[in-house]
């Protein structure tokens, strides 16, 4: 796989996992997933894009420490800032759960990829 394809694939995995996080969160609160999925996901997706740009993640898209950790941190922090800016909830419990789940997802897949390669 070319480096451009690897980077695009890694970004796609990250984006799908962020949407999965948003969908499971809505399901866990017995909310309609399809109706509110975009409302829940967009702040984290926008923050994910920022994380990729800030860290230049395409240079080492599968790296756990160089890419995974900062992309995760920027996605969580940026997503929460954007949610707060538009009046969405940012309760401490939500911040903690989001940080843990997104860590497992965004850093976890990279760690698994490292283990199997």
Predicted regions located by residue number:
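Alpha-helical transmembrane segments and their membrane-interface exit regions
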Residues: 47-50, 100-108
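Small-residue-rich segments of transmembrane alpha-helices in multi-pass membrane proteins
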Residues: 17-19, 44, 70-82, 101-102
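Membrane-water interface at the C-terminal end of transmembrane alpha helices
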Residues: 13, 103-117
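Internal alpha-helical transmembrane segments of multi-pass membrane proteins
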Residues: 36-37, 55-74, 92-99
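Membrane-helix boundary elements
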Residues: 2-36
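Alpha-helical transmembrane segments of multipass membrane proteins
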Residues: 19, 23, 53, 77-85, ...
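Membrane-helix boundary connector in multi-pass membrane proteins
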Residues: 81-97, 116
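Structural signature of hydrophobic alpha-helical transmembrane segments
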Residues: 35-46
């Amino acid at each position: 796989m070319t480096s451009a394809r690897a980077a695009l694939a890694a970004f796609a995995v990250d984006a799908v996992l962020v949407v999965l996080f948003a969908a499971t969160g809505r399901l866990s609160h017995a909310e309609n997933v399809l109706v509110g999925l975009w409302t829940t996901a967009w702040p984290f997706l926008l923050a994910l894009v920022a994380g990729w740009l800030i860290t230049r993640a395409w240079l080492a898209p599968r790296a756990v420490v160089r890419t995974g950790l900062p992309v995760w941190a920027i996605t969580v922090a940026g997503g929460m800032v954007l949610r707060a800016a538009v009046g969405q909830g940012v309760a401490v419990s939500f911040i903690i759960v989001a940080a843990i789940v997104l860590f497992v997802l965004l850093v976890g897949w990279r760690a698994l990829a490292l283990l199997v390669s």
